[in-house]
Amino acid sequence: MTWYALQHKPAQGNRALAHLQNQEIICFYPKITVEKIKAGKRTKKLEPLFPGYLFVNLEQTDPMWSKLRSTRGVVRIVSFANKPAAIPDDVIQHIKDSLHTVAEQGGIKPGQHVELDEGPFKGISAIFQAYDGEERAIVLISFMQKQQTVKVPLSTIHPRRSGRSD
């Protein structure tokens, strides 16, 4: 079986997913938790990783192909030269692994104070800015009376223990 991408109607990803699953089609609709500030309050919301798209796993000879486009919420099958674009299994697995990594990284948020464990900045406090891929982070450190942005391995930072001030 092979993975393919489907485009769904705006704001109807969950509807398309439910109808596809009702037809016993194997689906993958990757979502991540995002933190947003709305009306001055931080809220966490689950959002699609690829807005407007979900993935299905089918054989090319599967009779379900003809039903895909008429499934509620589905717009079209992503195709090139009128042929559905196959997505390699390893790409889907990488997306799944990345979702797991993103969930694990959820412990450190932008603006949070962190401490560096290794390298030339060992023992220095910093402010976490962002993730830079799966294995690096961007932090802001005070260095020679200046704020400096530095990229460091994610494994070298941890949330700063409370009770300590700089």
Give the positions of each predicted feature.
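Acidic-enriched and Gly/Ser
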Residues: 1-115, 127-133, 138-166
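Short coil-to-beta-strand transition motifs
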Residues: 117-125
